[in-house]
Amino acid sequence: MLAEECELNPFLEHKGIEVVESDLGERILQLMHLKPSHIVLPAIHVKREQVGELFEKELGTEKGNSDPTYLTHAARKNLREKFLHAEAAMTGANFAVASTGEIVVCTNEGNADMGVSQPKLQIAAFGMEKIVPDRESLAVFTRLLARSATGQPVTTYTSHFRKPREGGEFHIIIVDNGRSKILADRKHIKTLNCIRCGACMNTCPVYRRSGGYSYTYFIPGPIGINLGMLKAPLHYYDNVSACSLCYSCSDVCPVKVDLAEQIYLWRQDLDKLGKADAMKKIMSGGMEFAMNRPWAFNTAMDLAPVGGEVLRMMGVTWGKGRDLPNFAKENFNEMWKKGKVK
């Protein structure tokens, strides 16, 4: 996802360099000219029939054949030719070990190993938050990543690189791009603990129903909301509303990033940013007025059934796709006074 963050592929292509994604999901999206919708399973939203049609057009596969095994073999054959003729290989890093200077790449397809096996030039780029102190720490994180991302004890391939192949070059790029500023932000520093496992997306009720493309930041879900706000709050402020504050993301996070709490803090900052929703501010002000004055609250409860009928007659947007619920004939206060509630 670092390439997406830095918009690396368009830059290289503009320089006349052919870029080929080697992860199968990323390759599918590259051929479709689409962005990833999940940080672990980038093409999870694409149906196999769509992949079949795409490969028929781009790779010359059989017409109408959408068998996953057949399509996988076709992609492997095509990518193998790319691997054999590549002049450079660029990988990210799931982790980097400070004590040994090695980088660690976790995959289930072996594409990282294939990619670096032929070219003499290998480049590894990763964010500074990926650095762990030693191999003992690495062992903990590799298990956390696999189990939280896909439920595996460990990924199929866990590859370590720390020096160039014989006669080759190995360049390591450690990216800041605003991360050092996050380190100085005491309220949101924990965001850098994220290991990009995607567990928060898998459990988020908003993401599961709306998908990755409903967010404006390139990383969707709860972690993407926070990262987007840290990157450019005036541009990505609309994402903070895509959260039910159910706290499920905070509960499942393997590294205990308090995602929901941070989203809640971002919502509190919207007014300072000048991006608070005007209607919500009016409604919140009205609720504050009513809650502090029992007579106003009781009057509102008495008038609520009338308001509901008016809204139903007006055919408001909420009622176009669902039935508007009816208000109870008696509110709680009335039932309490009549002794109906004990």
Put a short name on every predicted segment:
Residues 1-187:
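The feature marks the mature, well-folded catalytic cores of soluble enzymes
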Residues 157, 165-191, 206-313:
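Ferredoxin-type iron-sulfur electron-transfer modules in oxidoreductases and energy-metabolism complexes
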Residues 197-201, 246:
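Extended amphipathic alpha-helical segments enriched in small hydrophobics
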Residues 304-342:
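Short linear elements at protein peripheries
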Residues 4-7, 203, 252:
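Phosphate- and divalent-cation-binding pockets in alpha/beta enzyme and binding domains
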Residues 130, 192-196:
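Short, contiguous, pocket-lining structural segments
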Residues 9, 136-139, 143, 198, ...:
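Predominant activation on well-ordered alpha-helical scaffold segments within soluble catalytic domains
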